[in-house]
Amino acid sequence: MSEATNEPVLACEGLSKTFREGADALQVLDGVTLAVARGERIAIVGASGSGKSTLLHLLGGLDVPSAGAVRLHGRDFSRMSDAERGRVRNEALGFVYQFHHLLPEFSALENVAMPLYIRRMEREAANERAVAMLKEVGLGHRLDHAPGELSGGERQRAAIARALVTQPACVLADEPTGNLDRRTAQSVFDLMLSLNERLATSFIIVTHDEQLAGRAQRTLRLDDGRLA
């Protein structure tokens, strides 16, 4: 996790993204500026196709901007080499998506520990941390179950545990409740808010659900490529 400091955990300035195909150009983001404090939770709403997912991809270092900069712990994330950006991303950011993307051939425990295995953490230590995180999300009794043996809400809880097991400074969540029924979505959102408060991990949550977005500390709207 990030140290307690006035410096934003994650920030972007003048962020723009244009996709080109032949002579055609489509500007999806136009001069977006955002700063995320340690432990802050921000919701981003907007119409379908407004660029919300593109913004998360840029903030997470999964794509590079056409203009502007992304800074992670004050470092110019968008100007790093692919290898360095990948290393820093894996150390400081967690990701949750609408679909859980759990690996079906592995148990819940193994799925959650996978980012630590990739870091070459000693297996016993990785499993111990994964067990603790699964208990945090209420799945301590489902460690050995495969994703196919979990409910939709449980799979998303496991995905959240996987995002947090590396102790990231910020979690980027793209429609994390979009594939769930209303009651389960509420439960998963409650869990994220609780983890945000207990772990002091920042959350940026893209959602189409205005009611859930209203529970964030800040709700921002992306419209015509601009954030307001």
From Swiss-Prot:
One of its GO terms (molecular function) is ATP hydrolysis activity. It comes from the Bacteria. It is an enzyme of class 7 (translocase). The keyword Translocase applies. Keywords: ATP-binding, Cell inner membrane, Cell membrane, Membrane, Nucleotide-binding, Translocase, Transport. Pfam families: ABC_tran. Residues 10-228 form the ABC transporter domain. It is found in: Cell inner membrane. PROSITE patterns: ABC_TRANSPORTER_1 (PS00211), ABC_TRANSPORTER_2 (PS50893), LOLD (PS51244). One of its GO terms (cellular component) is plasma membrane. Its EC number is 7.6.2.-. ATP binds at G46, A47, S48, G49, S50, G51, K52, S53. The keyword Nucleotide-binding applies. One of its GO terms (biological process) is lipoprotein localization to outer membrane. Belongs to the ABC transporter superfamily. Lipoprotein translocase (TC 3.A.1.125) family. The complex is composed of two ATP-binding proteins (LolD) and two transmembrane proteins (LolC and LolE). Part of the ABC transporter complex LolCDE involved in the translocation of mature outer membrane-directed lipoproteins, from the inner membrane to the periplasmic chaperone, LolA. Responsible for the formation of the LolA-lipoprotein complex in an ATP-dependent manner. This is Lipoprotein-releasing system ATP-binding protein LolD. It comes from Aromatoleum aromaticum (strain DSM 19018 / LMG 30748 / EbN1). The gene is lolD.
